[in-house]
Amino acid sequence: MEELSGKPLSYAEKEKLKEKLAFLKKEYSRTLARLQRAKRAEKAKNSKKAIEDGVPQPEASSQLSHSESINKGFPCDTLQSNHLDEETGENISQILDVEPQSFNCKQGKEVLHTPRAGDIQGQLLHSTSSPDGKKEQNTLPGTTKTPWEKSSVSQEKEDYFDTNSLALLGKHRKGQESISRKNSRTPVSEKTHLLSLRSQIPDPPALVTGIGEGILIPPSGKSERGIDTLVRGNTVSAEAAVPSCTASNSNHSQHLEHTPPKSGCKITTQGPASSTNLVAQDQKMTIFTVNSVVYKAVRAHGQLPGSPNSCSVNDLTHSNLPANSTPNSKSLKSPSNTVDERNEPLQEDEILGPSKNFNLAAVSPPSTESQIHSCTMLEGLLFPAEYYVRTTRRMSDCQRKIALEAVIQSHLGVKKKELKKKTKATKAVVLSSEDTDQSESGMLDTSTGQSSSGSLSQKLLSPAEVSSPPGPAGKATTPPPGRGHRGKRKSARTSTLGHCQLLFPPCAALAVNRSKGKFTKHKCQNRGVVIHDFELPDEDFGLLKLEKLKSCSEKLIESPDSKNCGERLPREGNHAALEELQRDSETEGLEEELTVPPGEAYRPGPTLRRQPGSKDLSSSIVLFTPADTAAPNDSGRPPPSLCSPAFPILGMTPALGSQAAGETLSTEAAQPCSTSQPPLLGDTNSLVNNSKQCNSSACSPKPDTNLQASGRQGQPACDSDSGPQATPLPVESFTFRENQLCGNACLELHEHSTEQTETADRPACDNLNPGNLQLVSELKNPSSSCSVDVSAMWWERAGAKEPCIVTACEDVVSLWKPLNSLQWEKVHTWHFTEVPVLQIVPVPDVYNLICVALGSLEIREIRALLCSSGDDSEKQVLLKSGDIKAMLGLTKRRLVSSTGTFCNQQIQIMTFADDGSSKDEQLLMPPDETVLTFAEVQGTQEALLGTTTVNSIVIWNLKTGQLLKKMHIDDSYQASVCHGAYSEKGLLFVVVSQPCAKESQALGSPVFQLLVINPKTAQSVGVLLCSLPQGQAGRFLEGDVKDHVAAAVLTSGTIAIWDLLLGHCTALLPPVSDQSWSLVKWSGTDSHLLAGQKDGNIFIYRYF
């Protein structure tokens, strides 16, 4: 523990650590060398066998000639399975040939006769040719363990079953051949091993050993692997053992019959999906040959349910899959891999669809030899170096190249691009959103598991079959029907959208690596294998473990009633909803009810409404919170990190519905200003949690007073006898649609009281709630002209930067500096005599520079206002002139502007130097539509968003100037003004205002709207509509958005504030002294709200 305390190491200790690290690297090198030697030896052996087996064998030829007539009608007698060796690029094939003995014709049918039951041997002989021409036979693993069986345990390769490995008829064969050619990656050479059921041993079948359990040994070296298949043909049924051995094919008018004196086997084949069932002494061995994939299942005392469209077994121990699968889905078996009835589930390799060439990344348990139990602590490493060594060894099954140095350097925090490229983690399977732009890509279907286009070559794994290794990332399993499994498992639920496109990016539990074109899926590891993890002694590392667990638990915020939110089956239909993993419990909705005591002053209710989505989307689509967003602290109020580009934190969006869908919520004793506990991905937590109570007393307008006092019922409220009143709004009349979140919604309100807030001249309490407005100070307008704009910026004077207020009237712009918390002093003034001032353009990261827009009705000039460093005199610099349609100040001291229309449009970015002069200009690619507004995308660097006159949203790359995407949004958002854009998990969250929106009885008076756009598919949906509270009149006049709060001036002269996290109006600021509000802006230096009146007076409020 000396190393953990930060004690510097001596030179000898450093040398010793270097030697130990070198030793650890050597251990890895040796492990890799052994693995490579084994692969090379096996490759050489297989190559030699392939050359020798390339000569046609006369016995095989005679057998084929004898059974030519049957092979014509029964194409599945020769069973072949291919697997691709990634190391050598060779395609190794295995052929299972059922050799008939004699044929007699009876009534037009061909009959096979064999002398006795022992002819059909359960032994699958591995026939190869030795250098001297003799044949070698490898029998059951109980008698001989061959070298290829031993090496199969440590092999790190993926098995591929070529879909062209069996002879198919008609279109199936042509389709499979074409798909196989598309999916072939490298030229391969074939190694063929003939497996025949020889009739050379007249003894009873050697298949029955021990307690009546048989083993099929595939000759590919994978003797301990089970093989799954896709059942695309007819049903394969297994019946009880009868003293006969029969093979029938009704489709091809063939009948194979064998009746030995002591038979215990029955072979049944139905339709093109042929199978071979061997039943001997109350045990069963089945070989399925379904569309070129060999299925092996060995189990005792079991039967296959014979339904027309399924092939499954009773025993689904390791994946809990449903008992019946769909035609294009698979059944997972748990074959035995020993003779003593251990029945352990093995890892399985599967082909899940020819169109995407799926494969399984095999994960084998780590080797337990050469265990290093010492503890070597290095400065900067959280755990001993041996921990990372053993972790890397366990990861070696998923990585093609081990880089111990990369693992250690990554934990030390050293970022090296070349090391990052080498490390490819394949533990989690992630469905990339890149496939959403393909109109013919297969969608995950909960009913059939096949693509909506219906093509046989486009099939995907159904959600009932998705499983991942257990771990902190969660599981994706589906319990069998009729049984409800509750616990820590999570369910992955999917549904389809229109034409195979997703609105929301998929969760991190599934992934398609498009560059490789393969879909990988992890299965549960063998339960019989014990994985020995590196254990840290508790006596030495107990405190470190506790700190690590504590830091991890703080990141996972769980709602107190998360047990009420749980697993629900998705609705049937064509709705796009890819929901994240959710907890297994039932959601019952909202039953709480709060009451308003009589005698309280009128307070308008919240107006959170869910606008129906676009024409292609259903209103049942629910937006969940991105995983990377910030979470509130324990006090329930938003932390300062919420006022950051990480936006938005949204729970389930309540929709407009009837009273039957949800209970009406009222307020109790006060005005609750609710804060949202943002649900993590996969949690269907409440939209509003830990709501806090605060009330406001009616008071006469007078500055420098607290606008709101909060307290419990019965406690004296703070006297607020002056100042413009800011009315916080209660959470009232939340309604939900029945179809929201598949018919269930969860909303919990928890009441907490807050301490009484202080007045303006006292420090505020720490537990202040959102929705409070506190008047700080007031600026009196000395000029007679009306105020047109106000802003806050940093101004540097005498080497010190201080926040200043900039006020703009029609003919003068003034800069105010603070004298104290309540008084301001005018420092600089710029006068304009020719062209009036229209607005102030704040530019972030720029000091001692003010940008203003001049013009009568349209912007004609952009000027920079600054002061000379010598005499401190004011001066003006013309930056741009012309028909300016839009402009915006960007980070890194940049200003973007758009001039002209259509073909003559020019979009230019101007960069300012430290002294305020323009030093660089850049042109952006103009769209074919006139740009009206700009918005910088928070959360994504170098991204700019703009809105056009024809209701489109365009995105630029600021670094290259390229126009990335143009997306048309719904026509219901006509003449929308973009106020902010945020990016999370590949989605765009855009806040727009609708000045021309009409008031409706259903939606009220809409002011702000939150749109979610998928740039990949150009689909958009409105998820949040901020409307005026009930009883408030007017329409949107002017507004501003900062982080998660939005403020707007209404035509009635009132200022309303919405919290986008809560989704409802939190405060109202009525007119003061019969002077209506004319403008409102959020301060860029702090959380102050700047409100201006028509007479030019500016009021500064603190919002918390």
Swiss-Prot record:
Keywords: Coiled coil, DNA damage, DNA recombination, DNA repair, DNA-binding, Nucleus, Phosphoprotein, Repeat, Tumor suppressor, WD repeat
Record region (Interaction with BRCA1): 1-308
Residues bearing PTM Phosphoserine: 274, 364, 432
Example of a GO MF term: DNA binding
Amino acid composition bias (Polar residues), ranges on this chain: 59-70, 138-154, 306-338, 664-713
Subunit structure: Homooligomer; dissociated upon DNA damage thus allowing association with BRCA1. Oligomerization is essential for its focal accumulation at DNA breaks. Part of a BRCA complex containing BRCA1, BRCA2 and PALB2. Interacts with BRCA1 and this interaction is essential for its function in HRR. Interacts with RAD51AP1 and MORF4L1/MRG15. Component of the homologous recombination repair (HR) complex composed of ERCC5/XPG, BRCA2, PALB2, DSS1 and RAD51. Within the complex, interacts with ERCC5/XPG and BRCA2.
Domain characteristics, as noted in the entry: Interaction with BRCA2 occurs through a hydrophobic pocket at the crossover between WD repeats 4 and 5. The coiled coil domain mediates self-association.
Protein name: Partner and localizer of BRCA2
